From Swiss-Prot:
Gene3D superfamilies on file: Uncharacterised protein PF01937, DUF89, domain 1, Uncharacterised protein PF01937, DUF89, domain 2, Uncharacterised protein PF01937, DUF89, domain 3
Keyword Manganese: yes
EC number(s) per entry: 3.1.3.-
Organismal lineage: Archaea, Methanobacteriati, Methanobacteriota, Archaeoglobi, Archaeoglobales
Domain comment in the entry: Subfamily I proteins are distinguished by three conserved motifs: the CxxC motif localized near the N-terminus, the GNFE motif localized about 40 residues from the C-terminus, and the KC motif localized about 25 residues from the C-terminus. In the crystal structures of the subfamily I proteins, the side chains of the cysteines in the CxxC and KC motifs face each other across the rim of the putative substrate-binding cleft, and the GNFE motif lies deep in the cleft close to the metal-binding aspartate and asparagine.
Residues annotated to bind Mn(2+): 160-161, 194
Protein's name according to its UniProt entry: Damage-control phosphatase AF_1104
Annotated function: Metal-dependent phosphatase with probable damage-control functions. Could hydrolyze oxidatively damaged purine nucleotides or their biosynthetic intermediates.
Length: 288
């Protein structure tokens, strides 16, 4: 998915958000915005994939701020909220008529742990009620039966956010019961609110998946040229790729890797429009 005219304002908003997480120095924040504008000006006209451009911008901002992980406290908070709500989520999945479908929905509800997205608020304090309400609301696009059918061979699960990854474990367990091999992939370095190896271990993903890999240098989503050989091989040999979140959708929706199950909450207009849903809708869409 190529960058939309709406994307730059959101990117700059997120730059400001993450800079404010670590400093009140207006000159330093302005430098972050200035550098981001330069990168946008140099690259926007070529219509790159938004997540690829965002990766370049956030890496530069981190350099300016001199901080490895501006979102560290935010991610820790998300993980703690998710850890506390996970027993309820497990109860909802296990008590449903279709645990696989419900685990898909719960994992997508977890996709709301996405900080700094323009117009999107993470409801930490009321997440229990939010979870129950969204499960009742259900999916706008529901390809869960096809996802279940495709989960028999080698499955690669591309994670997205910290916090969210706790809810992913419920779906991973459902997939693990059916598949030949389950590989989970996280970010190789801290980038925005995305899950890294540390978050995966905290959520005990390493105890569920047969293999825990990274996307290399910590890109937002997937940049094929940055993938470690073992991750690229796993993706190329997968019978199903489960791709969580909007960044993975942006990176892979026009690519050749298939079949892919895109599981996400459409949190912005460009992604919602590209999929054909409304902002706020939950999507489980298979592309073959």
């Amino acid at each position: 998915m190529k960058i939309s005219p709406l994307c730059p304002s959101c990117l700059l908003g997120r730059v400001y958000y993450e800079a404010k997480l670590v400093t009140d120095d207006e000159d330093l924040i302005s430098q972050c915005v200035d550098e981001s504008l330069k990168i946008l000006a140099e690259n926007y006209s070529s219509r790159p994939i938004n997540a690829h451009l965002a990766t370049r911008i956030h890496r530069r901002v981190y350099e300016i701020l001199g901080v490895e992980d501006p979102y560290a406290e935010v991610k820790a908070r998300a993980n703690e909220v998710a850890r506390q709500v996970l027993p309820l989520a497990k109860e909802i999945v296990e008590g449903s008529d279709d645990p696989f479908k419900t685990a898909v929905i719960v994992s997508i509800v977890g996709n709301n742990f996405d900080y700094g997205v323009q117009g999107h608020k993470v409801v930490e304090e009321e997440f229990r009620d939010f979870l129950k309400r969204k499960v009742q609301e259900g999916l706008k696009i529901n390809d869960t039966e096809r996802i279940k059918e495709l989960s028999s061979g080698k499955v690669v699960y591309l994670t997205d956010n910290a916090g969210e990854i706790f809810f992913d474990t419920l779906l991973m367990k459902e997939i693990k019961r059916r598949c030949e091999k389950l590989t989970a992939v996280v970010r190789g370095r801290p980038i925005i609110s995305d899950a890294t190896i540390e978050d995966a271990r905290l959520a005990r993903v390493d105890k569920i998946a047969d293999e825990l890999l990274t996307n290399g240098k910590g890109a937002i989503g997937i940049i094929m040229d940055e993938l470690p050989d073992e991750t690229r091989k796993a993706l190329e040999e997968a019978d199903l790729i489960v791709a969580k979140g909007m960044a993975n959708y942006e990176c892979l929706s026009d690519g050749s890797l298939k079949p892919i199950a895109f599981l996400l909450t459409a949190k912005c207009e460009p992604v919602a429009r590209d999929i054909g849903v409304n902002v706020g809708d939950m999507v489980a869409k298979v592309v073959e």
